Regions:
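Conserved acidic catalytic loop of the alpha/beta-hydrolase fold
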Residues: 196-214
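Conserved alpha/beta-hydrolase catalytic His-Asp/Glu region
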Residues: 274-319, 327-328
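Conserved HGGG/HGGXW glycine-rich cap/lid loop of the alpha/beta-hydrolase fold
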Residues: 124-187
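Catalytic active-site module of serine/aspartate enzymes centered on a nucleophile-bearing elbow/loop
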Residues: 362-395
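DNA-binding patch around the recognition helix
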Residues: 2-4, 10, 24-25, 37-42, ...
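Short amphipathic alpha-helical recognition elements used for nucleic-acid or partner binding
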Residues: 22-54
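Flexible "cap/lid" loop of the alpha/beta hydrolase fold
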Residues: 227, 231, 238-271
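Short beta-strand/loop motif that positions the catalytic acidic residue
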Residues: 332, 338-340, 344
Length: 395
């Protein structure tokens, strides 16, 4: 999205503020403050809300936020006296004081490196057709993302939730991702939706692309698939990046009574409301995946959910609850980076920490976010990119 006000344009896809077309330097936290204020320009934003959005669970003094507001005003040719752009409501918070026009990215902006994604199909060991896509830097080292719950190659490419992942990770890498069996453009009547079948699907995709050596990016349940594949084929995996993942599903966790009720409630929500025209049931998942998202992003989750049959959604969810890769994780001998959001509502932080303790030599990076899928406007996304690029060696 591009937000225009006066001589300025805030481009959230490019993570950039421009003045009369020229990029302006902003520190990550200052940029995040601007994004949040602009995205919620129709109302007052409290200081507490900004602090929770930018710094998460860390303790900061009011002076820290005020210094970021001051830096933002300087960048916008504003000041605390005139408050032309950023207005302070004493004792309450801040709001945008100028008219802001929002427009979607031009279609060409969704192309990566001037090209679109290339979608192809391959067959898994049991004949199921798996849809996969390649995009990004064709001459870069391969980076493969094992599938996670709820994907659709075409839908994700244009989404307000995933497109910055695809574009940024494709800058330095030939980025390869696929729809898991039962989802998206892959066969929906797959029959076998077991964990072993998921690993075999990853094997089919990398073999179809004739990849000899590559890195894996596991997200959520994709972390377990990446681990299992690496143990089977250690000679083919260069490095492992695991974000928002876990070694054990809900069935093997020491859950509180409240967490057990939550798990049962989510399963029943899928059974009862997944196929209904009323989106209320499906929107629960959107707010769990991206609690700090916008209505547009929650609507995207609702639209995505409608592409997946209820029976498949439930079967895949129940299979994720039965995951246990602890014996495989301790057997890894591959450089591994583990990242996890402290406030993740879908996969609690402790699961990521435990995963990192199981993998020999793994480095663990906590991220200050409540989102299971990082959004492009939050500081945690910039930190994620910096850590991953430094680890993989990409620009």
């Amino acid at each position: 999205m591009i937000y225009e006000f006066g001589d300025f344009a805030l481009d959230t896809r490019r993570h950039e503020l421009r003045r009369s077309g020229e990029p302006q330097h902003l520190e990550p936290q200052v940029y995040a403050v601007l994004c949040h204020l602009v995205e919620h320009r129709d109302r007052l934003v409290t200081a507490r809300e900004l602090i929770e959005r930018i710094w998460g669970h860390r303790f900061i003094t009011p002076g820290t936020l005020n210094s970021r507001i001051k830096a933002l005003r300087r960048a916008l040719d504003d000041d605390g006296t005139t408050q032309r752009v950023i207005q302070t409501v004493r004792g309450m918070g801040f709001r945008i004081g100028v008219d802001v026009k929002a427009r979607a990215d031009p279609p060409s902006a969704l192309a990566i490196g001037g090209t679109s994604q290339q979608i192809r199909f391959c067959r898994a060991h049991d004949g199921v057709r798996i849809a996969y896509a390649t995009s990004g830097n064709a001459s870069g080292s391969p980076l493969v993302k094992p599938a996670n719950w709820l994907t659709h190659l075409e839908h994700d490419w244009n989404s307000a939730v995933w497109r910055h992942w695809v574009s940024e990770l494709g800058r330095a890498h030939r980025f390869i991702r696929y729809d898991e069996r039962g989802c998206g453009l892959s066969d929906h009547n797959a029959g076998d939706l077991s964990f072993d079948a998921w690993v075999c699907d990853l094997e089919a995709v990398v073999d179809a692309e004739r990849l000899e050596r590559f890195s894996l990016l596991g997200i959520s349940q994709g972390c377990a698939v990446a681990i299992a594949y690496t143990v089977r084929h250690p000679e083919r995996v260069d490095k492992l990046v695991l974000y928002g993942g876990y070694a054990v599903g809900r069935n093997y966790r020491n859950q509180t009574p409240q967490q057990e009720i939550e798990g049962s409630l989510l399963r029943n929500l899928v059974r009862v409301g997944w196929g209904r025209d009323n989106p209320a049931f499906r929107q629960v998942f959107g707010t769990l995946f991206v609690p700090e998202g916008t209505p547009e992003q929650w609507q995207w989750f609702n639209d995505l959910a409608r592409t997946l049959p209820m029976e498949n959604a439930l079967s895949i969810m129940e299979m994720t609850h039965g995951i246990d890769v602890r014996p495989l994780a301790v057997a890894l001998d591959t450089p591994t980076l583990v990242l996890h959001s402290r406030g993740d509502a879908m996969v609690p932080f402790e699961n990521g920490r435990m995963l990192a303790t199981l993998i020999p030599g793994a480095r663990f990076v906590p991220l200050e976010s409540r989102n299971h899928v990082l959004l492009e406007t939050e500081p945690a996304w910039a930190q994620f990119l910096e850590e991953v690029r430094g680890f993989l060696g990409g620009a």
